[in-house]
Amino acid sequence: MHETGKITRKAILLSYWVDEHEKFKSDLDFGLVKSFLKSAAGGCFRDEEIGEYASVFFTRKSLFELLDCYDYMFVYFSGHSLFENRQVQIPLKNSEVIAESEFIRPDKKLWIFMDCCRTQREPMNSPDFELPRKENLFPQSCPQRRENWVFKISQMEPFSLIYYVTKLGEFAFSNAIGGFGTQIFFTTLMEKLDSETTFDFGQLVREINQSPIAIQESSYIPGSLDLKEFSSLF
């Protein structure tokens, strides 16, 4: 499952949808995220290291058990969520929920990616937007790049990076082929990695927010994470 003696890792992609059309959009977003995860920039994840789930598959207990099993986890969520006490609340099985802060586990390394609204306001229609799905330009996976990535993250101190596709109190929009935040993050990342030799995560987020096609503003909480060290993973 992973390089022996270095680090255990898992990516879990979660979604909450209410009809087949929303499930279709979620599946497209999952595909884009998986393209990144399987690439050299994302860590050369193998299929068995990536789990795709409806969020209601999990109870709180079973999700916590999964989170506690690995040294590094990439957690992605898209779809409908609740919002309470200034936190995203993800619906789970048996009407349970998990708050975004509860994903953070002691002594673990986590990147949490939230493509959902962060407001209690009544939903509004998404503005029109079009982000063409581009060919996969992420750097290709290979055994050496995988080994290097695993070694680098194994040397990092525990961290919890939370990336939000929208600001506190705002909506996250989508169209027929998925969430705006997921699409613009990974397509912009793809373009930068294809054209630049030095990558900077903070600069990526600034460019996303300054894009002339931006309809929402992303943000992130790095906690104790060394962003320069994290950027070297890409």
Feature map (PLM): residue ranges:
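Cysteine endopeptidase catalytic domains of the caspase/legumain-like
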Residues: 1-234
